[in-house]
Amino acid sequence: MITGIQITKAANDDLLNSFWLLDSEKGEARCIAAKAGFAEDEVVAVNKLGEIEYREIPMEVKPEVRVEGGQHLNVNVLRRETLEDAVKHPEKYPQLTIRVSGYAVRFNSLTPEQQRDVIARTFTESL
């Protein structure tokens, strides 16, 4: 479990009023802010801090999103004939919405060139 602390008493004056994250499972402390002697984000064994007294600091943990490469997939569930008919008869499909490069757009609001491009990219004969 991670606990946020502010050191209120320490033999080492550089630690006084410093802020740390204590990882009780690993027996480590990560420096958040200190006057001197410790760098921001430096991780040390808790026993390296020596004899200390501290008060717990409430923490708000926000989920972290990590993106490591990855893929992007747009899925449009319809038939090629539907889009081709929408090109010829847009009045029949005023609400036809498709995904294009990560956003939703009404098919009829695209230019004719964009519509042809969507049809060409969306439907393939094989992978």
Curated annotation (Swiss-Prot):
Any one annotated GO CC term: cytosol
Source superkingdom: Bacteria
PROSITE patterns, per the entry: GLY_RADICAL_1, GLY_RADICAL_2
Coiled coil location: none
Gene3D superfamilies: 3.20.70.20
Domain Glycine radical residue range list: 5-127
Residue(s) carrying Glycine radical: 102
InterPro entries listed in its UniProt record: Auton_GlycylRad_Cofactor, Form_AcTrfase_GR_CS, Gly_radical, Glycyl_radical_cofactor_GrcA
A Gene Ontology molecular function term of the record: formate C-acetyltransferase activity
Function text: Acts as a radical domain for damaged PFL and possibly other radical proteins.
HAMAP family: GrcA
Protein name: Autonomous glycyl radical cofactor
Native organism: Citrobacter koseri (strain ATCC BAA-895 / CDC 4225-83 / SGSC4696)
High-level lineage: Bacteria, Pseudomonadati, Pseudomonadota, Gammaproteobacteria, Enterobacterales
Gene assigned in the entry: grcA
